[in-house]
A protein has these predicted regions:
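Conserved beta-strand
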Residues: 10-13, 20-30, 37, 61
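Short hydrophobic beta-strand immediately N-terminal to the Walker A/P-loop
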Residues: 35-37, 49
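Helix-to-loop junction immediately C-terminal to a conserved catalytic motif
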Residues: 53
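Conserved ABC transporter NBD signature motif
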Residues: 61-72, 76-77
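ABC-family P-loop ATPase nucleotide-binding domains
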Residues: 79, 83-141
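A short, proline-enriched helix->beta-strand linker immediately N-terminal to the Walker B motif
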Residues: 148-152
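Catalytic Walker B motif of ABC-type/P-loop ATPase nucleotide-binding domains
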Residues: 154-158, 163
Length: 182
């Protein structure tokens, strides 16, 4: 069996809200693997994912990607990871192309051809406004953005929400095309 390198380490992650506590979450992830969280609504899956990428600040614990701490190397790490949190539900009045023109500026490795391929594959029109898209099409748009900058790790929250089976299969095929860890 191939000895794959560890690319994500979460140790004793804790986050408290008034009515919820995430306690001592720890795990590691090796390159080229797929990992999933299963749990009831409100169990802390989204809080864990958002804490991992520093969108929610954890109370205690550590998160390292590629051996670097997310809190001290956030910009560098975010060039190498990508995340999509369910459907795109912001900037409802904006056209996809407008959102993309801002989004892609954050990534040194943005691949316009890959992005256009995903738009075609997912049948997305860059001239449409977000509010004109179904839930499933919004998810596809979020995935098109997430998959278009050659990330090494793809972090998905509710990745199949509103997607048909063909689109679900496409996500898994994308993993093999880009050698992603999901």
């Amino acid at each position: 069996m191939e000895n794959k390198r560890e690319i994500l380490s979460v140790k004793r992650l804790n986050k408290s809200y008034d009515a919820f506590k995430l306690r001592d979450v720890s795990f590691t992830l090796k390159a080229g693997t797929i990992m999933g969280f299963i749990g009831r609504n409100g169990a802390g899956k989204t809080t864990t994912l958002k804490s991992m990428v520093n969108l929610v600040h954890s109370d205690t614990g550590s998160v390292q990607f590629f051996g670097m701490d997310i809190k001290t190397h956030e910009s560098e790490i975010k060039q190498r990871i990508s995340f999509a949190f369910g459907e795109v539900d912001y900037y409802l009045q904006k056209k996809l192309g407008t959102i993309t023109s801002v989004y892609k500026r954050f990534y040194d490795q943005w691949d316009e051809k890959a992005y256009e391929d995903y738009l075609n594959r997912f049948e997305l029109n860059p001239n449409k406004k977000v509010k004109e898209l179904s839930q499933g099409m919004r998810v596809k748009y979020g995935l098109a953005l997430a998959l278009s900058h050659h990330a090494e790790i793809l972090i998905l929250d509710e990745p199949t929400s509103g997607l048909d089976q063909v689109s679900r299969d496409e996500i898994l095929r994308s993993k093999s095309y880009h050698k992603l860890t999901i």
